[in-house]
Amino acid sequence: MTRRPKSEGDSRPRAPKRLTRASLARGVRALSEVDPDLAGVARAYGTPPLWERAEGFPTLVLTILEQQVSLASALAAFERLRAAASVVTPENFLTFDDARLRAFGFSRQKALYCRLLARAILDGELDLSKLSSFGDAEARSELMRLKGVGAWTAEVYLLRALLRPDAWPAGDLALQLAARQVKRLDARPTAAELDALAEPWRPLRAVAARLLWLQYLEGRRETVRL
């Protein structure tokens, strides 16, 4: 039997449908072979955490809260909601009025976005449990139909909840800052520039994102130690 020669496209590493700790480690090794800068991050800090979140309404609420604020303040607001609701469900969320949500730490806009999300789920307009069977583009499009769910929120949900190996939140500030450092750029890249920079990392951009997040977090710790 004659073996078909590899095409140029075959040189890219293959990606699993869903990342696991084992496939994440394999992905780090694969990216290290094609990008010496990412290899340096892996040598310095090892394989990054999976940073997995459960699929569903609570994770999407938390991700909405994380839009353009510190992760610590978003988590604090979410924990206040969870303490009051016991279980964060669409039904429970809709029992809180705007004043109560503001007391938890929700801005007026984010309270509206989460309320619209809860209603979409209860009205049958959105079934988050079905997203795992969708392709990346379809899952992204389904999420972005919702008011308040933009590209960053959808990509982070794909990356952390659905564990898609090529999810890539190019608008993420921490990714941009880490990429500037790792790639020794003169300025923080824009989302479009980061997309272009990440092209060689397909179809494992979510693995690269975890490496860059790890670089960002470890870099901050080293700065504090100084």
Predicted ranges, named:
Residues M1-P48, S132, D136-A137, A151-L226:
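C-terminal accessory module of base-excision DNA glycosylases/AP lyases that mediates lesion recognition
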Residues R18, D37, V41, V69-K147, ...:
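Alpha-helical ds-nucleic-acid-binding substructure associated with the helix-hairpin-helix region
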Residues A25, E55-T59, A139-R140:
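Alpha-helical scaffolds flanking conserved acidic
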Residues A42, E52, G56, A103, ...:
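Non-catalytic interaction surface on structured domains
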Residues L50-P58, G105-Q109, A198-A206:
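Structural motif
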Residues F57, V61, S70, A74, ...:
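Hydrophobic (often cysteine-bearing) scaffold residues that line and stabilize catalytic clefts
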Residues V61, C114-L117, A179:
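Buried hydrophobic packing segments
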